[in-house]
Amino acid sequence: MTFKALHARDRTEHLGYGVFVHVLTSSVDARLAAFFEAYDAAFILDDEKEDLAGFKACLDLNDGAAYARLSALYGPYREVVLMLTRGEDGPVLGAANFIAFAGDGASLTVSLSYIFVDSGQRNRGHFSRLIQLVRNEAKASFAWPGDTPEPLVFIEMNDPVNMSPEDYALDSAHAGLDQVDRLKIWERRGARIVDMPYRQPPLSAQQTADSDLLLGVMGAPGESLDACLMAQHMRRFFGVTVLKGADPDSAPVAAEQLARLDAACTRRERIGLTGFERIFEQAARVPRDRTAPA
């Protein structure tokens, strides 16, 4: 069997109790407008946000000549939007956007770009449901040559130590959730912090790089990750999702990080994974407005 991505998985499913999941992989899907409206209301910091054109540009890379070119470089991949609604055509409860990379068929890595639950729908299991849907959909997006691997799911998290006081207060108030409390949500779900400097390259020509982020991972079986696997995944993520198909070596922020990872790969090093204790201790020493409304 030829190893490939499966391109016909867009659908709507009833999950029970009136909750529906919508799976989107096309920029012309009419449901994308509802997703973007909810997404745009959930995120407020300019340099972390995609505009609608950015999402469409990413989804356009799932097919045609662009997919043929990029999959030849990076292997099979799928960019996916998942959206939960109350009723098939009802209000958005939450959503996630991710890209899954299958590499050579032996591993599965995922970058979870965005995940959110509507502020009025929290504590109802929607976040956990979305996380599981991301894992399941990533695995089901490819015709695997052998056993289906469990995914490594990479996440970007706001760094409560490096964020400016203004961004910290604005984002916490907008979300109704303190930055440290957000990290605790990821910690409870088994996430680890990838022990390496991380900067997200600019998402568009109008934006700047985001250095106020921590890179985390869920699903890692040990205390470290192979540097070669990290280099491959980050090159794919930067090249497809962040830079919309452009060469990551042509973007200085991406190229600098990839050069470090490539060198670590050459030396056969491993990238350590840590818990959240150190960042919590550091955050406790930084004066912040931690009065985000409930």
Regions found by a protein language model. Name each.
Residues 117, 122-140, 149:
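Conserved acetyl-CoA-binding loop-helix of GNAT-fold acetyltransferases
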Residues 94, 123-127, 190:
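Glycine-centered flexibility sites
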